[in-house]
């Protein structure tokens, strides 16, 4: 089977040469089953999932977009890491894995197994931790989560439907380009009229907006879903509110001013038909450190997030995506090669990254043990030394923190602020409901 990559996915693939972007999906299972026995179980499951038998093949000189083809062998893609480790050791293993990015020409995935993990949250005894590493070109967080569910025992999880690509001739290219231009003008008019929110402004850089260097640290806070929610407040917004408070206190701890424009670069699912494996965009969301009442802050953050979604839902966005599909592969690849990953902008879309994905019901099982929680770790980038993942399964929500020593030399200090902030936000939301 040969499937040509969508231009969006090809761009993600080519960009990985400049900014590593593999995804790492962690699932913790409450079982003392040996990793060796679980490995065979998972290999059998992987063989039944066609998407896990793929690799990326380049076309000479990028005259066409790369394609997905069958990989010759996947039997050595499940790696057993050292067993009998603590939960902190396991997180260090995750951070170490960031440095060993996939070769997608061989396979688009790899699985790391760590058995006998002691002290894992919500586990009664030793735990088995599985970390699915997957090429971002192969799918966004929702695609990757669907694959993980199938690998870990959910036979009902269906792959995300992706529309077939059609050949685009000169006439169709002209039609799409013209429509994109017309709708871009309409977006400008709608923005001026106030019917569509304006673009989010850039934000001043803070101490974490530096190139990642030194040790990479990973931390996870596993909490109940109810700690983040209230009427009108989603898990994403509740977590963003806690992050805003923790960042505010961390900056003050180091004697830095807290900019009123403090914000997060959030991932938002695109509207319309999924035409690519990566069907999302990024937008800057206000974190509103100027509002001291945490319930009111949460509602203000929710309004900012909804404003970004309303703008992204304008027909101009989808028209632009359709027009970009007609860009020749050689031209898009040339443009990616011109990208300067070392350039430092005056402002940033967000001061940290916030990626939030719901990974379904807690009905997965490996080695006879149920899943207790899941986590994810958005990649660091040249001006982003701190990222946050918010991932839920069942009633458990994990807020993960990935940081570089150059941006945050004291991650445990920050995580203590974040842990307390979640408690305070939860209390504030409950009190607001009782009024």
Show the residue positions of the predicted features.
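N-terminal alpha-helical "arm" segments
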Residues: 1-17
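Soluble acyl-CoA-dependent acyltransferase catalytic core bearing the H(X)4D motif
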Residues: 1-3, 26-47, 54-383, 391, ...
